């Protein structure tokens, strides 16, 4: 069963752009040889890391989005793990997230349709504005009780 995955990995900052491009190309060919389809490759460039990793404070971020069998993902992760230029990597299966978001949208649409069907035909009576409430409120009498407070008794 094919699933949609995202793979984000961080390459050492001292690796040249040519090395990064060659590494990305080998990963892409490895994925396609395993029967996967690579949907998107984004190179985010050098960014500062949140914390130090192997004495490095920054790294080159690369994002893959692909559709593959789980065995293809295992092979990709193995290659990233043994590679010398990769600092960190993260694999996320996003097809479940997309299904969950689609389900939420359908539920939201159902609730909106139900609310529209149950809505009254005539508009609801308008609430008086704050300015109208202030002008209609009784004026305070000096030395008398404050309007709106219960009377002492």
Swiss-Prot record:
Keyword Transcription in annotation: no
Keywords (A to Z) from UniProt: Ribonucleoprotein, Ribosomal protein, RNA-binding, rRNA-binding
Similarity comment: family membership: Belongs to the bacterial ribosomal protein bS6 family.
Bias (Low complexity): 127-143
Listed GO MF terms: small ribosomal subunit rRNA binding; structural constituent of ribosome
One Gene Ontology term from the biological process aspect of the record: translation
Signal peptide positions on this chain: none
Region (Disordered) location: 101-153
Pro residues bias: start-end ranges: 144-153
GO cellular component: cytoplasm; ribonucleoprotein complex; ribosome
Keyword Ribosomal protein on entry: yes
Function (record text): Binds together with bS18 to 16S ribosomal RNA.
Matching Pfam families: Ribosomal_S6 (PF01250)
Protein name in UniProt: Small ribosomal subunit protein bS6
Record field: compositional bias (Basic residues): 101-114
PANTHER family reported in the protein's UniProt record: MITOCHONDRIAL 28S RIBOSOMAL PROTEIN S6, SMALL RIBOSOMAL SUBUNIT PROTEIN BS6M
